[in-house]
Amino acid sequence: MKSGKFPAKTILAVLILVGLVTILSYNTFDKKPKSINWSHYGGSPGQSRYFEASQITKKNVNKLQVAWYYPTVDSGFNYFSPIVVDTIMYVMAKNSSLVAIHAETGKEIWIHANLQGLTRRGINYWESKDRKDRRLLITVNNTIQAIDALTGKSIMSFGNNGYVDMREGLDREPTSIRRMQSMMPGVLYDNLLIMGSAPGENYFSAPGHVRAYNVVTGKLEWTFHTIPHPGEYGYETWPKDAYKYVGGTNVWSEMTVDTERGIVYLPIGSPTNDFYGADRIGANLFGNCLVALNARTGKRLWHFQTVHHDLWDYDLASAPQLLTLNRNGKKIDAVAIATKHGFVFVFDRVTGEPVFPIEERPFPPSEMPGEQAWPTQPISTLPDFTRHEVTKDMINPYYSQEEKEKWYKRIDAAKSGLFVPPSDKYETIMLPGALGGANFGNTAADPKKGMLYILTQEYPSVYKLNRIKSAKELMSAGDVELAEKIYTNNCRACHGDNMEGRGIAPGLVDAGQRILFDDFKN
């Protein structure tokens, strides 16, 4: 896949959030603020990011003061979302260490050092009903681990000597799976930790089955096959035995739980490969689906597929949001999902019936040999929140005339529009693009008012399919399989499909002639 992006100045609507941890100076108010727990990623199992507080208002927000400071990052980026229970804040800091901090003073309570490979977006907190057992559930590389929340020590009775290997039980030899770590902390329901995964979205990636583990023992309690096995619902939407070789179709983002009903909602990603599906002809359930499961058993209750046979990497990346709506004089407990391609789909939480009509509309076929783009796609009748076609009038007016002309010619030669399949004959310009729309962390809700909030961006991206040279053309037959796996999993994203190089990553085609082995190794 050849991928290009418009220059940064042509990005149409990108919002960047920068957060500062602050505590209100007590002398600003009449009394000490009431402690509010933030014990789940997203604030609650519902991922609403909502809490009731009246102390910070438009009138006094300018009086916020930094109460304490704790350095969290040695270098680079940190996407970690802290959680707060009672007066303790848990945060990733100091070279991939997990730290407990007193939330009122900033004083360090304990540190569990050097957790290289710790999920960089968050952790889970669980406690027994008597509160005698309090633990943090974390993922480190391909494992799940448990840490005592009060002492910071590893709980060795969890799993196998303190570890649960997430590579096991995935229709593949575990040792052949390089990457299975979840990018997100998962979600808790009662004594179950429900986990998604990020196995990668290239060939040789593992399938992204969703699994639930006992938080005390680490025992696997249930598995939902996102690529169905024989006899399971949706198996016929794939070629025979697709679960043995197709990967992805994973939940890499935020899952949501309706704790009262015991339902977990899964926003499932696209199958491998993101932009080419000739080896996975069919609608490809449960790729790109919002799926409702019985949280205790993993049994499917209902599903809705937002993109059939995805060729655009329009996986579901935002958290499903739980809302109570008034519709035609009737209260409806609903779940809403906002998509990368700019639509909002709303369903009855229990039945899966659409609250607002959804239409199946026709779209262009693919011109690629063997590819079978799905003839229709579901379109919500609610207003979309992004544009879908790049036109010449969108080019940055401050570009030089020469630069404008270059882009005018490129737009004329390309195809742009919603659900235009990628091709190897011309460029396809996607808008809002695979990085746009409602992406990871981009939705929130006010459950009481029935309000859904979406942070959206438009990220026009240029794609063109390239034929990838077979390793058989370059290597001896005995090393082909191993070499393809190594390059795909470790090198391809930066150095290109055919080792041609991308951006600052150099080409590797003639590396053997240009670089001595010892230099290359180092």
Language model features with spans:
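Generic beta-strand/beta-sheet core signal
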Residues: 92, 139, 147, 196, ...
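Repeat-blade elements of multi-bladed beta-propeller folds
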Residues: 38-42, 77-95, 118-144, 178-202, ...
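Short, solvent-exposed loop/turn elements at domain surfaces
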Residues: 45-51, 75-79, 99, 274-275
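Long, low-complexity segments enriched in small/aliphatic residues
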Residues: 377, 381-449
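Extracytoplasmic/lumenal domain signature
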Residues: 59-73, 98-118, 130, 144-177, ...
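Post-cleavage N-terminal segment of exported redox proteins
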Residues: 11-25, 446-479
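Extracytoplasmic electron-transfer domains, predominantly the class I c-type cytochrome c fold
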Residues: 181, 263, 476-481, 485-522
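Mature N-terminal segment immediately following signal peptide/propeptide cleavage
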Residues: 32-73
